[in-house]
């Protein structure tokens, strides 16, 4: 959530920066309500000052019968004040409602652009392999090896669900353990295992609600939401808390399944594992001092890259432009892995800095000094990595002409020494 004071003092700049997202986001409603709020505050404070002054006069009158007119007058004033306070509460709630639907301001370092075509390539790692045959897409490889069963997934549930079998299921489990071991042992993250369902406050804190409710799976009695990413429960671990400056940055790594309705994705990636309603992911979440969040984003991105490097999967790092960053993000790097079976790079991780946007919504703060006023932390998160898409990348990059798939060296200890799926 944006700072109301900042918007009030910089409303034209705020609208200009929001416009770079490519959305129609005018703050006329905010401006009108904010002016009404300030007028109500001014009038209410004037009446409260009058009430205090007259109350002092009444206290000095010994014969209270001579103060009846003033007492009656102050009762009327008190009623007016109560009415104004009630109206002010309604205006504050309306302003809060507006702010909850306004996206974050792009960071000055975010490239300005109109679509994903304006994203900027930062670097590449590895060289796509050359094959003496036409590489197959992962869904063909998985079905031929009997490790991915899309038909059974559809029978059990519906479209965009998959059953993994044998070495396919084992590789998912191996990748989760490999990623968590790397991030906890080498990168300094604390592993947590959060609930896979959260309440409305948690979804609001990270920015999924109120704007993106149609993208979520939810229960109605009680009202819980299946998480679209571990970012939601892990960021909300510290909701409503004041953290110690000495504890920053706080780093968490979490494996969870993720659940997304994929509203608006009809017809996209209908085959394979790229776009599923349920998928596994290892998430990295950080709480940072504001002065260090830019540096922490670079470290977070490097931590996610390390997974791809150890698995020897070619990838590139893209800086997302202002029109392509997520609702809550101020700055984002996407890691895109090379998929020879599809002859393109596809996103496998998104690493973002949110500034104080989520912290303001979730009220996560720290103190610069022991007795100083609390300030909002900066939050960051990124996939480290999307497990299903990593499996996709392994199947396509390590496929052999005979239809088998070689297991990456780094993953073999987690696969019981298995060197090849055939």
UniProtKB/Swiss-Prot annotation:
PROSITE patterns (alphabetical): AA_TRNA_LIGASE_II
Cysteine disulfide partners in this protein: none
Residues annotated as binding L-serine: 229-231, 283, 383
UniProt subcellular location: Cytoplasm
Residues at which ATP binds: 260-262, 347-350
Comment block on domains: Consists of two distinct domains, a catalytic core and a N-terminal extension that is involved in tRNA binding.
Listed name of the protein: Serine--tRNA ligase
Organism in which the protein naturally occurs: Pelobacter propionicus (strain DSM 2379 / NBRC 103807 / OttBd1)
Gene: serS
